Amino acid sequence: MAHKKGTGSTRNGRDSNAQRLGVKRFGGQAVIAGNILVRQRGTKFHAGNNVGIGKDDTLFALVDGVVTFERKGKSRKKVSVYPAAAAEAVAS
């Protein structure tokens, strides 16, 4: 008679890949048109001036400029991109 136990099986051992969400370009950073600013699920950040929104809620720059994070009302946050010349006027 064999003296080895059967090894059995497990139902664990799986994990999904990370989605790599989050802010990709921060406030004050220079960006070019097409740069991804925020990868998100849902609209944690809303699109502001010169920012487009993809079908998966990704925010991206529509023009070359500088990124700014702003408040939109009490609880909403929005991301805008201002052209370099206009960004200096907004900052001051």
From Swiss-Prot:
Protein family membership: Belongs to the bacterial ribosomal protein bL27 family.
InterPro entries linked to this entry: Ribosomal_bL27, Ribosomal_bL27_CS
GO biological process: translation
A GO CC term assigned to this protein in UniProt: cytosolic large ribosomal subunit
Origin species: Nostoc sp. (strain PCC 7120 / SAG 25.82 / UTEX 2576)
Keyword Ribosomal protein belongs to the record: yes
PROSITE patterns for the chain: RIBOSOMAL_L27
The protein's name in its UniProt record: Large ribosomal subunit protein bL27
Domain of life assignment: Bacteria
Disulfide pairings: none
